[in-house]
Amino acid sequence: MYKQFNANITVLIFIFVISGCSWNSRIGNKDFYYRESILLKANNHAGLITLYRDKLKQKEDDAVRLKLANAYYLTGDTKSSLYYLQPIAHKDDESIYILQAKNLINKDDNIGAAAVINKLLAISPNNAEAYNLIGIVFANNGEISNSETAFEKSRALFIPDEIAMNNLAVAAMFDDRYSDAIRILLPDYLAGKRNPLMLHNLVFSLIQLGDKQYAKKIIIAEKMAKDPDELILALSQVDNLSQQKLPTRENNE
């Protein structure tokens, strides 16, 4: 009798522990947003992925699913981002289309990206990000004139100037117009803007035009490398820039 009673207590305790763990794993909305705000401030994408996955285990939510897909995108995991987007990919939503297009561009699927961007423009004809992304598609396809037109349209629709100007500069670089790239980037640098991608493109363009002295001055001032001469040598040996791809993450996040 005692053994049976003891066994029953053990089972009850075991069940209680399991139930307690399950209860603790449920995230209330207040706690969810609190944790999310901390993780966002820390740029802790891995933590955000865990948080969003746990929330979706409790209940399906399109907004949380989109956040999960975006967190995967920000870690560079295009495959997972597209996978978790799939259940909501059919919905006419600007944010969904934008994230789809970014992922497809990163996969070098410019045809697929263009198709998604066209859907985006159909529901949002004046979407600045749509024109920025189609500009990237054009640039990656070697259609430099079309890419510049798209970037200018994006800028006219008030995408951040830093994004527009950098992409216009890269389009010029793809076309071996390094003096144009410097003309676009240098004013922002002199105005105190220090975006890492912009700095890299400015230094690269200066080196391509033979102004290694000014390039070295910027590298030292901005602490871009421990050995400025080594970086200059490496950048001076880069060729076939037109074979490179214009990224999406640095321009939009």
Q: Which stretches of residues belong to each language-model region?
A:
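N-terminal leader/linker segments that initiate helical-solenoid repeat arrays
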Residues: 20-83, 250-253
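Terminal, low-structured helical/coil segments at or just beyond the last alpha-helical repeat
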Residues: 192-253
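Helix-start (N-cap) detector for alpha-helical repeat units in TPR-like alpha-solenoids
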Residues: 28-29, 62-63, 93-96, 128-129, ...
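Structural marker of alpha-solenoid helical repeat scaffolds
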Residues: 57-58, 90-91, 123, 156-158, ...
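Structural signature of tandem alpha-helical TPR/SEL1-like repeats
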Residues: 42-50, 75-84, 107-116, 141-153, ...
